[in-house]
Structure formats: structure tokens, C-alpha cells
């Protein structure tokens, strides 16, 4: 197993785990959903489904490259909720909230996650992508 596969499996397992948490502890995630989106429960469940699917894609070798692109896209799409949490000092379902430093660390980790996801997808900036998988 190479290092890229190891990162994909670990990242995929993390996405599946967090996705399952969206079903088992829905109330914990609901405060992060910006009110203008409507039903927080819907968005928590929907994002949980997507996180599980993306995680599975990262784990299965034949579609791992798609999982890399999907996880990068997911991390980009979910960041506005994290930004909402940061700007509005939102408390999670257990009453905890991140400090300014914690939110900054989260941003750096999210950017790193996007980079690793694109690396897993074997994406190279400026190169035409061929589906050789």
C-alpha cells in the first residue's frame, strides 16, 4: 500500500465516521447550519449522506480518484457553515465552541484537506486531466 492509498483510506474512514455521526447525533450539528438555509435537520442528514458516500469513494481503489475530487468539493461546499460558526461564535449541540485560534486551525486543516483530496485524485494544476483510471 502506498502513502496516497493510506491517506485515502484514513480520510475515507474519517468521512464515513463523521457522516454516521450526522445520523446518531443530529442535534450536535444543527447549530452550524446557517438559518437562511432552512431546516437544519435536513441539511445535517443530507450532508451526512454525502460524507458517507464520499468516504466510501475514497476507500474503494477503482473510484478513489473520483473520491478525491468529491472530497475536495465537499470540503469547499461545507466551509461556509464553518465560517458561519466562526463569525457568529456559534455553539455546537454540546455547548462547546471554537476559539479564534481553533477556527483558524480549522481553516488551515480544511485547506490541507482540500490539497490532500486533490493529491489523492492525482490532480495536477495546469494539466489536462485524462481518465486513465
Regions picked out by a protein language model, each given a short descriptive name:
Residues 1-133:
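Membrane-interface extramembranous regions
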Amino acid at each position: 500500500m502506498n502513502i496516497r492509498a493510506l491517506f485515502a483510506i484514513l480520510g475515507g474512514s474519517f468521512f464515513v465516521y463523521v457522516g454516521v455521526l450526522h445520523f446518531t447525533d443530529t442535534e450536535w450539528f444543527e447549530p452550524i447550519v446557517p438559518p437562511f438555509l432552512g431546516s437544519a435537520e435536513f441539511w445535517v442528514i443530507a450532508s451526512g449522506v454525502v460524507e458517507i458516500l464520499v468516504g466510501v469513494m475514497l476507500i474503494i481503489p477503482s473510484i478513489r480518484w473520483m473520491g478525491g475530487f468529491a472530497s475536495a468539493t465537499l470540503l469547499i461546499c461545507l466551509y461556509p457553515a464553518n465560517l458561519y460558526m466562526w463569525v457568529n461564535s456559534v455553539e455546537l449541540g454540546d455547548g462547546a465552541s471554537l476559539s479564534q485560534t481553533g477556527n483558524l486551525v480549522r481553516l488551515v486543516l480544511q485547506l490541507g484537506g482540500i490539497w490532500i483530496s486533490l493529491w489523492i485524485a492525482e490532480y495536477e494544476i495546469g494539466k489536462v486531466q485524462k481518465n486513465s483510471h
